[in-house]
């Protein structure tokens, strides 16, 4: 089964980082967040990826084209124009890098890579957040309910600490990062049947936002199910998010690192 990853956005709230690279290439622990996302799927045996590139797509293509070199010590013989690799580590991944346009919306990006999916079910997620979603459990749930689409639903944490204050203004408890307002939100990690492509227009699809009409119509037709994930999930939307994720990684307490 293929895993599609949206990786074409501009990442305007991370402008200090994304002037030179696309948002999915912003690093956590010295590796792009895209790599961390792929490692989760790979841990569960899913190694066939389709990356929907857009903004500065050449950065993503260069990373994977030279992946073997990035992960090894090398000896370069300039006279012979020869490179010797030492103790290189690689991944069992097959990666299709598709340029889906600079300003294309998510529905258009998905429609543009339909030719790489064929008539098979596939998974879809975003290239700017990490989680510890149990992928086999997600798939089992998807096939059990039999609908066309499953979306992982998450409860995002609040941005600020929460205080419980008694009548005399005494603080009875303090919670550093409680859950947000109690509303479930789209956490990515979707499983989709190929019929989902029928919900995206066949023409003028570049302006189609997948999270609008396609998903809304799937919901109206009773074909969209939620897989509730109460474990770790965190998007990297701001420099603060990037700092927090790097601190988790550097402290050896990254909940999304399920691999060894």
Predicted feature descriptions by range:
Residues 121-123, 130, 135-143, 155-158, ...:
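Catalytic-core segments of class I nucleotidyltransferases/pyrophosphorylases
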Residues 36, 108-112, 214:
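Well-ordered alpha-helical segments embedded in enzymatic catalytic cores
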Residues 59-167:
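Conserved beta-loop-beta/alpha segment of the NTase-like Rossmann-fold superfamily
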Residues 1, 47, 119-121, 222-223:
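Short coil/turn segments at beta-strand junctions that form active-site/ligand-binding loops
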Residues 3-5, 51, 124, 149-152, ...:
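Structural beta-sheet core signal
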Residues 1-62, 66, 97:
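N-terminal glycine-rich phosphate-binding loop and ensuing alpha1 helix
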């Amino acid at each position: 089964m293929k895993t599609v990853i949206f990786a074409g956005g501009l990442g305007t709230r991370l402008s200090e980082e994304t002037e030179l690279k696309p948002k999915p290439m912003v690093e956590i622990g010295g590796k792009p967040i895209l790599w961390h996302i792929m490692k989760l799927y790979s841990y569960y045996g899913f190694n066939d990826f389709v990356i929907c590139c857009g903004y500065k797509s050449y950065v993503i293509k260069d990373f994977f084209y030279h992946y073997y070199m990035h992960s090894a010590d090398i000896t370069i013989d300039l006279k012979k124009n020869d490179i010797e690799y030492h103790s290189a580590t690689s991944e069992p991944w097959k990666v299709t890098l598709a340029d889906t346009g600079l300003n294309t919306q998510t529905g258009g990006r998905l429609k543009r890579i339909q030719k790489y999916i064929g008539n098979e079910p596939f998974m879809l997620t975003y290239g700017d957040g990490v989680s510890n979603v149990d992928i086999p459990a997600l798939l089992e749930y998807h096939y059990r309910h039999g609908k066309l689409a499953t979306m992982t639903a998450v409860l995002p944490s609040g941005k600020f600490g929460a205080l419980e204050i008694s009548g005399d203004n005494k603080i009875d408890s303090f919670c550093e990062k409680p859950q947000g307002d109690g509303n479930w939100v789209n956490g990515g990690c979707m499983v989709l049947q190929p019929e989902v492509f029928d919900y995206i227009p066949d023409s003028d699809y570049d302006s189609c936002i997948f999270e609008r009409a396609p998903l809304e119509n799937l919901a109206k037709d009773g074909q969209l199910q939620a897989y509730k994930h109460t474990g770790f999930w965190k998007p990297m939307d701001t420099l603060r998010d990037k700092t927090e994720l790097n601190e988790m990684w550097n402290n050896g307490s990254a909940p999304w690192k399920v691999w060894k």
